[in-house]
Amino acid sequence: MKSYSQLLKDNNTLGKSYKQQSPDTLSAFMQLHKAAMAPGELDLKTKEMIALGIAIAARCDGCIAAHVFAALKAGSTQAELVEVIDVAVLMGGGPSLTYGIQALGAIEEFAAESQ
């Protein structure tokens, strides 16, 4: 079984390397991320749950790790995130079920680490 905590750490490390090699692109993406996730009509918790659902449907392990971690940090409960998985499965079918189950593993891993 993969460690989502380790995946998140690895992506952060590789992101630093990418920033050195392509600073303009990463900077522009981070500005977009900051703007999209800024509180507005939707709070950060809600936006992270939306991002997690999309990450599951898009089958992106690194995105799942990042958005599970961020959603829990923003105050999402495990029960709320399971409902996010449910909606992602509805929209993405069998492949989303497979990645939704992986997301549940990430939820359980990060929740256990925070206790």
Regions found by a protein language model. Give the residues of each.
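Amphipathic alpha-helical segments within well-ordered protein domains
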Residues: 33-34, 51, 68-72, 85-86
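Short cysteine clusters
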Residues: 60-63
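Charged/polar positions on well-ordered alpha helices
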Residues: 55, 69, 73, 90, ...
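C-terminal structural segments of small proteins and small subunits
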Residues: 82-108
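A ubiquitous short alpha-helical element
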Residues: 13-21, 51-55, 72
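Immediate flanking context of iron-sulfur cluster ligation sites
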Residues: 41-58, 82-84
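Acidic, glycine/proline-rich low-complexity segments that act as flexible tails and inter-domain linkers
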Residues: 1-46, 98-115
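Iron-sulfur (Fe-S) cluster-binding segments and ferredoxin-like electron-carrier domains
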Residues: 27, 66-78, 107
